[in-house]
């Protein structure tokens, strides 16, 4: 989904976050890892080409990487793309050595809170990701709302000290509409 031509949800969050961080901190070298067979589109995730962003593709089918991660906890992605800190914009199969501080963003836990709204296939997928194991491995968790933080504490027993709430910013295209604007009718 991150290499999809139509960008929404987590890919949009990721692109906007990296764009903002790379702009705010030009002294930091931002290394972006992605995998799969697809070619990265020219303006992937709406990231402008910045001299402090470098790309680290792993040309391998994601299903193969996911299978190896699930069965063998390999490949250790932080060995492939070393960094001072790993930022995971969403939980997925992410085999890491545990030697690099890691921050994980959790957008919601609806699949745990209301599993009846998910197909058996989606429930299996979420269960296979072993989210509790990943949460134990990471150093910090960003929750995008107080509700997500509460769900993390209630459903997965995550200590509140490990969670920071950072709300997602509004899309810059969003602008207030004047009361006289005919679109309000």
Where are these regions (language model features)?
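Carbohydrate transferase catalytic cores enriched for Leloir-type hexosyltransferases
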Residues: 1-185
